[in-house]
Amino acid sequence: MRDARTHREDEMTQTDTQATGPDRAEEQDGQRYDAFALQEKWLPVWDERKPFRSGEPGDERPKKYVLDMFPYPSGDLHMGHAEAYALGDVIARYWLQRGFDVMHPIGWDAFGLPAENAAIKRGLDPRRWTYDNIAQQRASMRRYACSFDWDRVLHTSDPEYYRWNQWLFLKLYEKGLAYRKDSLVNWDPVDQTVLANEQVLPDGTSERSGAKVVKKKLTQWYFRITEYADRLLDDLDTLEGQWPAKVISMQRNWIGRSTGAEVEFAIEGRDEPVTVYTTRPDTLHGATFMVVAADSDLAEELAAGAPDDVRAAFEAYRTQVQETSDIDRLSSEREKTGVPLGRYAVNPVNGERLPIWAADYVLADYGTGAIMAVPAHDQRDLDFARAFGLPVRVVVDVRDDDGNPLPDPAESGTATAGDGVLVNSGALDGLGKQAGIAKAIEDLTAAGKGRAAKNYRLRDWLISRQRYWGTPIPVVHTENGEVPVPEDQLPVLLPPSEGLNLTPKGTSPLGAAEDWVNVPSPVDGSPARRDPDTMDTFVDSSWYFLRFVSPHDDTKAFDTDLIAQWGPVDQYVGGVTHAILHLLYARFITKVLHDLGYLPFDEPFTRLLNQGMVQMDGSAMSKSKGNIVRLSDQLEEHGVDAIRLTMAFAGPPEDDIDWADVSPSGSAKFLGRAWRLARDVTSEPGVDPTTGDAALRSVTHRTLHEVSQHVEAFRFNVAVARLMELVNATRKAIDSGPGAGDPAVREAVEATAVVLSLFAPYAAEDMWSLLGHDPCVARAGWPAVDESLLVQDTVTCVVQVQGKVRDRLEVSPDITQDALRELALASEKVQAALGGRDLRTVVVRAPKLVNIVPA
């Protein structure tokens, strides 16, 4: 990362250095480029003219929906925001210039724990903290020249928005996709609330508080996302080439579909069999014991019928397991623990009695919470068997590359998990893996003891939270059960926070708001209590992109006619941190709404761009490291345009940026050079460019053509590099070519202003004005490219004397070595550098380089 970006900064520095002389001369005439003055000059004009308003009645332009992931209002904008909004803005402005009616809205993901925790810490109302931060961020976005349609703003904490969260909940409830159940949940002991599986980090800690997550049994609300597991997985194929491969891979792995069989094991002393899911039913003959998750209901039931000493040992062990994170439990490095339950299962293929153990390395929510242990061919089972002296039976003959049998796992301690031929397996002996699996499933099905099955890593989405600052769940509870609040009684408003103790205590603060909680049932008026939990804020963001098409509609969540025109989102921009959470949930909700008839599409985002992180000195910015760079400080030092241009030029957008390696001052110098071009043009607007210098026109049109290609491919840094080349060529044409009055110079500078408006809108707007045009350059339109000028008639040849550049010659791409040698030696600048000295050697690399070494 560092080397590549440093190279790009060197390129910018070299570009500026080459023009140091002319720049200084131009600054001495009293008309200098002042980035801050331009910000003050043009922002009020844009506020008045609203060039980014979208969806005007009668607008027949083709539509393009560009969306940045909306921010959480946790303070002012930081450098990560600066990068994301700069890149998203390039895309939105580009398509606007290309003649599209671009909807580029913004809003705030305004509910959530940070506001509530800040309110507790500071003694503030969460509303005040949230909306004060929104006002601050909004002002910064305006200053940063984000091309948002400010008439479409939404806040998820507004009742006008979260009313439709509740409507969405009711729609899922009606379809059987929202339900309530008792289950073991991830519990954050610091924030005192539950977490979805996706909100637990790989190290077993909460993504929000950093606390070690534990298991707790609670009654919670879920969305049945597993009903859509196959579609969510299979439809990823349609996103190939449009979404980053990394995101697609992460979602595939998270959904985690596997194929295998469900096998029924009879349990001695129990009427109902236990169903076990396995991907290797061919190895059933190698099962020597059964393991059930220690925190599962099944383990508790089996232990209840055991002797007192077994039951007591199990209860103590169960408590220990519930205090251990899933990540720790699944660690291959962790010592295996467990307790026998004194019960036996019967292997359906050979009738053997298998002792049943409760252990922590099996999770209650994987499959049925019970596994058949085949220790010879599964390392975790083998580790457990060796720890407790359980038998190990080889049923797959696995060989090394030389055809030699691998060591016995019971002796080597290493399970043989590769493919091989089945042995010690009755009728399956001699079969390979796939044939063995197929035969095992066939036999189990015929015997009524099993069936083919799929399993998923994905679990239903836990959406209830025990906190205040969120969307109230629109359900009341009566003595006869749960009752959904009718749609005509929405929204269920949050009560004021005054008088409520918001400090985390394991139950929702709303439960203490007696006047709010106690209500009559909407069915029969009998006493009822509102559900005291609030929704996961990822519900808010799972459909917000739909609301933007009609954000002020108080009759429906979104206008179905408008969403059919605008949707799905053509271009989505945001960080890869949301690959599993937000993006998966948004895909799920979109498919549900499609199935309910509200949407004509079932994928929310056609294209996705993940920008990298902004770091400092090789590590993420954080308060604890003391390396945070404030955006406001950078804007005060360098100006908006320089920061935006730096973000685009720093490197490929998906790469991380190390702010220590980039050069906003270099960007500012380049902007001054570009701006002075517009000041120097002397021809009038409307002059016929075809009468101008052909070489410069060729550079201009090649730049427009290539910038289009690079922007559409997200190669923003390369697009900026091409723009720099055009600025250099234009300066050369003014100073030592056809001059400032040449029509080709005006064409080049106008093209520069239009392209620059994608990256540095203030400077571009002023250039457009200096060129004699009315505001706004954002709507100027992309200049038409003359295809005939894309054929490069000349190339620039660099002529060096003793390694120093002395001249640049425009020559034919087909020029011969001899002709180029003579042309270079005839140059007056070269002759002056030689000073009459003889030549030692002349190296010619036609058509781009001549290096002359004098004697």
UniProtKB/Swiss-Prot annotation:
Catalytic class of the enzyme: ligase
Biased composition (Basic and acidic residues): 1-11
Designated gene of the protein: leuS
Region (Disordered) residue spans: 1-31
Alphabetized UniProt keyword annotations: Aminoacyl-tRNA synthetase, ATP-binding, Cytoplasm, Ligase, Nucleotide-binding, Protein biosynthesis
UniProt-listed NCBIfam families: leuS_bact
One Pfam assignment: Anticodon_1
Record's protein name: Leucine--tRNA ligase
Cellular localization per UniProt: Cytoplasm
Reactions the enzyme catalyzes: tRNA(Leu) + L-leucine + ATP = L-leucyl-tRNA(Leu) + AMP + diphosphate
Record keyword DNA-binding present: no
GO MF annotations in UniProt: aminoacyl-tRNA deacylase activity; ATP binding; leucine-tRNA ligase activity
InterPro entries: aa-tRNA-synth_I_CS, aa-tRNA-synth_Ia, Leu-tRNA-ligase, Leu_tRNA-synth_edit, M/V/L/I-tRNA-synth_anticd-bd, Rossmann-like_a/b/a_fold, tRNAsynth_Ia_anticodon-bd, Val/Leu/Ile-tRNA-synth_edit
Stated family: Belongs to the class-I aminoacyl-tRNA synthetase family.
Sites where the protein binds ATP: 623
Motif extent ('KMSKS' region): 620-624
Covalent S-S links between cysteines: none
CDD domains: Anticodon_Ia_Leu_BEm, LeuRS_core
A GO-annotated cellular component: cytosol
Motif 'HIGH' region boundaries: 71-81
EC number(s) from the headed UniProt entry: 6.1.1.4
Principal subcellular localization: cytoplasm
GO biological process: leucyl-tRNA aminoacylation
